[in-house]
Amino acid sequence: MAVKKPENMTFEATIEELDSLVDQLENGDLALDDALRKFERGIALARAGQTKLSDAEQRVSILLSEDDEAPLSDFNPESE
């Protein structure tokens, strides 16, 4: 099975894989090279998850803005 890029995964799948990696790393039975690969993957997953959360927070802020007369516009995460 091919490993998905973190940015192409759902937030829930990202958290699930990250949780699994943490369990494996905490177990301590991995060779150093395997542990380092899993750590690098975990960092990529954590960063992707943080990006997804930031995007969601921005969308919620837009929806809850106090200006009821403001026109709605599409959210574009690349604009930041």
Swiss-Prot record:
Keyword Mitochondrion attributed: no
Segments passing through the bilayer: none
Keyword Nuclease applies: yes
GO BP of this protein: DNA catabolic process
Catalytic activity reported: Exonucleolytic cleavage in either 5'- to 3'- or 3'- to 5'-direction to yield nucleoside 5'-phosphates
Family annotation (InterPro entries): Exonuc_VII_S, Exonuc_VII_ssu_sf
Entry similarity comment: Belongs to the XseB family.
Annotated function: Bidirectionally degrades single-stranded DNA into large acid-insoluble oligonucleotides, which are then degraded further into small acid-soluble oligonucleotides.
Subunit structure: Heterooligomer composed of large and small subunits.
Protein name (database record): Exodeoxyribonuclease 7 small subunit
Species: Vibrio campbellii (strain ATCC BAA-1116)
Gene behind this protein: xseB
